[in-house]
Design a protein with these regions (language model features):
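Post-signal peptide N-terminal segment of mature Sec-exported envelope proteins
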Residues: 29-50
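Short amphipathic, basic-aromatic surface patches that mediate peripheral association
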Residues: 47-59
Length: 175
C-alpha cells in the first residue's frame, strides 16, 4: 500500500511538473504569435527623399544638390542643441553620447534618393539634416522623427523644398 501511495505521489509530481513546462511552452508560443500578428518589430530603417526642382538656391536662384545625413539617436538633446556648423563639421564628436549610426547621401534638384540601413537596437529617434548653402536661423534644415512613428512596412518619406526638409503634408510620418 505504502509503495502504491508513494508511486502515485511521484507520478502526480511528474505530471504537475510536465504541465508547468507545457503551460510555459503554450504561453511563450501565444506571446510570440501575438507579437508577430499585432506588433511588427522595425529592424530596417528605410528613408525615401524627394526633392523639388528648386532646392538649395544660390544668390541668383539656381538650384543645387543637397547633402543629407540621417542619424540614429538614443536621445534628441545633443542633436537639437547642436548648431548647423557643429553638425556639418564635427557631428560624430558632438553627438557621440547619443549617436547609434550615421548615413549620408546627396539629393539633386527634382531628384530622389533612397536609403536602407539596419536599425540599431538602442535607436529611439531618427535625426535628419539637410546641409543647405544658406541655412536660415530656423530649424527647417533639421528634422526629428521618433522611432515609434516609423512603420515596419513603409519607408519614412521626406521632401526637400527651397531650404527646408519636411514630411509630406498629405501623409503620416511613416510615408
Amino acid at each position: 500500500m505504502r509503495v502504491i501511495a508513494l508511486s502515485m505521489v511521484v507520478v502526480a509530481s511528474c505530471l504537475l511538473l510536465s504541465a508547468c513546462g507545457a503551460w510555459q511552452t503554450v504561453s511563450t508560443a501565444t506571446s510570440s504569435a501575438y507579437q508577430a500578428t499585432f506588433y511588427k518589430k522595425i529592424t530596417v530603417l528605410n528613408v525615401d527623399l524627394k526633392a523639388r526642382a528648386m532646392i538649395n538656391p544660390d544668390e541668383v536662384g539656381r538650384p543645387y544638390s543637397v547633402v543629407v545625413r540621417v542619424y540614429q539617436l538614443r536621445d534628441t538633446k545633443t542633436f537639437t542643441s547642436a548648431s548647423y556648423d557643429d553638425l556639418l563639421t564635427k557631428d560624430k564628436t558632438v553627438l557621440a553620447q547619443d549617436l547609434q549610426d550615421i548615413r549620408g547621401m546627396v539629393v539633386y534638384p527634382n531628384g530622389a534618393a533612397s536609403m536602407s540601413q539596419a536599425l540599431k537596437p538602442n535607436t529611439q529617434y531618427i535625426g535628419i539634416v539637410a546641409f543647405y548653402r544658406d541655412a536660415k536661423s530656423s530649424d527647417s534644415w533639421r528634422l526629428i522623427v521618433p522611432k515609434k512613428d516609423l512603420s515596419a512596412d513603409d519607408p519614412l518619406v521626406l521632401e526637400l523644398e527651397g531650404d527646408s526638409i519636411m514630411q509630406p503634408k498629405d501623409g503620416p510620418a511613416r510615408g
